[in-house]
């Protein structure tokens, strides 16, 4: 059990759940000044103003946190990340500055193809080590749940390697992690002249092996057949 008291500002509080918030309502965030928050069994047990706090009746296994001059708010949920990757593509930033389009960079072997090449040579241990550093960084910045995509493998074996890494990361961090199989992130070089065969490979081989939690197709102009992604 945890009691957080003397909270300067408790952010995003609602007496009753809301299905969604849209339009002008998004400008308003419900807050309580000088608040308390009780947590029991990892769930919020109660909250309110310190002026209305009834005090503590059961001190058993209770941890008290004084949050004077501090703000308490929900953690962030990052629903789109590529935390697992090998190396960077900073050289392509110069290409973009010089006016090259993503498609032009891709045709030269850059973009996702560049990342796939780097990932091919990286070990699972190397990928885990670098990804853990990134996860720790976003956790310190307030993220509590994160989605991680594959998609830099572009082959069944490499995509499986990425998904194994993501699975292992779940056990190495307190963050909630959801995995997404993004095998159709780009078309590998060997399938550039027969793109439909790559889509068939994803559907017939990869999906049959139930890779990841979800199959998603990314539509990029000139990189995919639109009709093949529906």
Language-model segments: what does each one mean?
Residues 14, 83-90, 157, 224:
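Short, function-defining helix-loop hinge/capping sites that tune catalysis or transport
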Residues 13-72:
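Histidine-rich, glycine-flanked metal-binding segment
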Residues 8-12:
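Conserved beta1/A-loop at the N-terminus of ABC ATPase nucleotide-binding domains
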Residues 62-129:
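Metal-associated gating/positioning segment near the N- to mid-region
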Residues 115-130, 136, 144-230:
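Metal-coordinating catalytic core of metallo-dependent amide/deamination hydrolases
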Residues 7, 37, 42, 69, ...:
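Divalent metal-coordination and catalytic microenvironments
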Residues 1-4:
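Extreme N-terminal starter segment of soluble prokaryotic enzymes
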């Amino acid at each position: 059990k945890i009691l957080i008291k003397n909270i300067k500002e408790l952010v995003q509080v609602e007496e009753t759940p809301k299905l969604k918030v849209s339009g002008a309502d998004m400008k308003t965030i419900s807050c309580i000044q000088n608040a308390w928050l009780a947590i029991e069994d990892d769930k919020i047990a109660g909250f309110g103003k310190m002026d209305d706090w009834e005090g503590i009746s059961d001190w058993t296994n209770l941890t008290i946190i004084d949050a004077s001059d501090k703000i308490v708010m929900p953690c962030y949920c990052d629903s789109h990340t590529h935390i697992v990757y090998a190396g960077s593509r900073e050289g392509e930033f110069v290409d973009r500055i010089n006016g090259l389009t993503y498609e032009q960079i891709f045709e030269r072997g850059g973009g996702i193809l560049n990342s796939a090449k780097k990932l091919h040579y990286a070990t699972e241990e190397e990928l885990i080590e670098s990804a853990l550093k990134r996860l720790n960084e976003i956790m310190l910045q307030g993220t509590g749940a994160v989605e991680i995509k594959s998609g830099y493998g572009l082959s069944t074996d490499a995509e499986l390697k990425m998904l194994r890494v993501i699975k292992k990361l779940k056990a190495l961090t307190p963050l909630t992690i959801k995995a997404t199989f993004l095998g159709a992130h780009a078309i590998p070089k060997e399938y550039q002249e027969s793109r439909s065969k790559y889509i068939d490979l994803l559907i017939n081989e990869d999906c049959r092996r139930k890779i990841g939690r979800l199959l998603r197709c990314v539509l990029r102009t000139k990189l995919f057949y639109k009709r093949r992604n529906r």
